[in-house]
């Protein structure tokens, strides 16, 4: 029987034996529902940069300085392919699949809708949504925080921002989940990409006929310089990455953070007593500790860096969530400490591909936490309930059953 790509061990001749460390990013048995802690422990004895022979073979980068060096060197490490293992027709994302300076006009087109001023203006609506969603969940007593809160709130925000039909939330959320669940299946990725592009094409057609003040209409009308507007293919490629990011990233950061918070009654009491004063610090620490995106790069020019022979055609995976827990940069990196002095991390990447939505993501977690502790006195993990998870290029907590004591 032919082995699946994840089972075959691929070690090219240029990879030194001392840099080889077995790890399957999609299904490593050492990783559990406390994904970040167990993931870090599983590779603790690996080199700072190591070759994982599974999934076609690729480099993995776990230290913050090394991640930053690769993320800021597009001459050698390109974003034009972002699938591990490599696939024949990789999805094309704008601006993620463009190296600088080609990505810059698109980032400029997006920036006004995601900057601090725009996000601040959204806050009343964020707060209203969060309250409605939490109130509905609390009626159940014991419920799945992921299904009833974390998979609803950020996705609602994204869909409203884009001008999408909120009644299709669960349909669109399911599409995004299946895309990330099948990262090592080229045929599934191609089929699901086609479905997502079909959704976005329909939205483009709708907004051309009936423009509004939402993000899709902004893309259609955006001046890219010299009076040029984006082609439909450009808008589709940009919308594709926003669809995936908006449906999955903040959802899972929030889920992992609340899984940890459910086990910290003392911190819950502090947030209950002063959510408005402490929610910003909680959001900052949640983002540092519970990043979910690992960013691939394709080596396009040979380079020896940090004692590692990167060769053209190699795939590289920057482990952003692990880099943000680098014990050379953070004291007690696996402890959720809202009193920690705010310091730089790489959860949102760095350099030319710093996540455009990082201000909005932080605001969503902050507002949700304030509204949660207006209504919740304490909560805990529901006993003996499984907490399934997903790893890969985007990590996810798929269920988080909790028991809640509502505030009086």
Please state what every model-predicted region is.
Residues 1-408:
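Cytochrome P450
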């Amino acid at each position: 029987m032919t082995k699946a790509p994840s089972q075959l061990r691929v070690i090219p001749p240029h990879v030194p034996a001392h840099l080889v460390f077995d790890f399957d990013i999609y299904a490593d048995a050492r990783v559990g529902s406390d994904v970040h802690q167990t993931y870090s422990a599983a590779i603790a004895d690996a080199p700072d940069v190591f070759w994982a022979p599974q999934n076609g073979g690729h480099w993995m980068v776990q230290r913050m300085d090394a991640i930053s060096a690769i993320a800021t060197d597009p001459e050698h490490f390109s974003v034009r392919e972002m699938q591990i293992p490599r696939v024949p027709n990789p999805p094309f994302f704008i601006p993620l699949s463009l190296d600088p300076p080609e990505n810059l006009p698109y980032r400029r087109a997006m920036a006004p809708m995601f900057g601090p001023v725009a996000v601040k203006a959204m806050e009343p609506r964020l707060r209203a949504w969060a309250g409605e969603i939490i109130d509905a969940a609390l009626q159940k007593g014991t419920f799945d925080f992921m299904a009833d809160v974390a998979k609803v709130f950020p996705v609602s925000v994204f869909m409203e921002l884009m001008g999408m039909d909120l009644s299709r939330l669960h349909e669109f959320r399911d599409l995004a989940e299946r895309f990330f669940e099948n990262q090592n299946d080229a045929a599934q990725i191609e089929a699901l990409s086609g479905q997502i592009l079909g959704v976005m094409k329909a939205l483009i057609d709708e907004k051309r006929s009936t423009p509004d003040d939402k993000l899709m209409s902004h893309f259609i009308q955006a001046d890219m310089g010299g009076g040029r507007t984006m082609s439909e293919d450009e808008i589709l490629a940009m919308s594709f990455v926003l669809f995936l990011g908006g449906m999955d990233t903040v959802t899972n950061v929030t889920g992992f953070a609340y899984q940890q918070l459910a086990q910290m009654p003392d911190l819950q009491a502090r947030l209950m007593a002063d959510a408005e004063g402490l929610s910003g610090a909680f959001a900052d620490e949640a983002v540092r500790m519970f990043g979910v995106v690992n960013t691939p790069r394709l080596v396009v020019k040979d380079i020896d860096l940090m004692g590692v022979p990167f060769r053209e055609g190699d795939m590289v995976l920057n482990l952003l969530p692990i880099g943000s827990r680098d014990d050379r940069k953070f004291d007690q990196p696996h402890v959720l400490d809202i009193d920690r002095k705010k310091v730089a991390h790489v959860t949102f990447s760095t350099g030319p591909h710093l996540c455009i939505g990082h201000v909005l993501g932080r605001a969503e977690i902050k507002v949700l936490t304030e509204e949660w502790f207006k209504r919740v006195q304490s909560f805990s993990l529901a006993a003996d309930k499984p907490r399934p998870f997903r790893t890969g290029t985007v990590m996810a907590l798929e269920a988080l059953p909790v028991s809640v004591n509502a505030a009086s």
